[in-house]
Amino acid sequence: MLKLAVICIGSILVISTLIDKSPIVLLTGLGAGTAILMLVFQDTIKGFVAGVQLIANDMLRPGDWITMPKYGADGDVMEVTLTTVKVRNWDKTIVTVPPYALVNDSFQNWRGMFDMGGRRIKRSINIDMNTVRFCTEEEMQSYRKQPWMEGFEATGNEEVNLYIFRHYLEYYLRHHPKVNQDLIMTVRQLQPTPQGMPVELYFFSADTSWLKYEHLQAEVFDHVLATLHTFHLKAFQSPSGMDFHNTIQK
């Protein structure tokens, strides 16, 4: 470092002597020139620094799926250069994002989901609260004969049909071959709303493929809707034109 400083100072003194100018004038000119160069190449400089940070911190790799709504990016990273990051969106459009934006702003990288081997499904169905009631003894006797009642924990002398339904759904998820059994899963109630009692299913698919993920999600909720009547429950939905028509006819 000392040798480098001596060389720099010596060079400045030699140049100032050759052009017959004060070293102070030369330093001032160099400072102004440096400022102009930084202004002209600021994107390149910031991109280079950001690129180093992205690589050093393993924040981004080609092939990663990222989402960055501010820049309209939602797809796979195609290329990372000093000045741009190219992202191919799912609609096949290509978005370019400056690397420093990925460092300064927040973005979502889905690599962890693929590495983990499970894709989260978090959806709820609204139950009509008018259909929530205690089960009769005959109903409980019928339920107890089913294999999904294994491990059932009674809450008291009378059981609520919604509680039985949640227990059934947990059994269904635990024995579904396309559900990741190594990750958390639960069926829970959310805060009641004017649209009914939300019952949320929270689990992870065993396959991270988008199409298989969507198919599993639809398959599970088709089953949920089809089994509601078994527990004498109904899903809530806003009245439609046909509902008003039937009411008028009555």
Task: Describe each model-derived feature in a short phrase.
Residues 35-36, 84-86, 134-135, 194-196, ...:
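Flexible loop/turn segments at secondary-structure boundaries
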Residues 56-159, 163:
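Soluble accessory domains appended to multi-pass membrane transport proteins
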Residues 145-250:
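Long, non-transmembrane cytosolic or organellar matrix-exposed soluble domains/tails
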Residues 1-56, 90, 94-120:
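Membrane-contacting alpha-helices and adjoining membrane-interface segments
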Residues 5-8, 17, 48, 83, ...:
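Conserved, well-folded catalytic cores of nucleic-acid-processing
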Residues 11, 74, 124, 184-186, ...:
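Conserved beta-strand residues within beta-sheet cores
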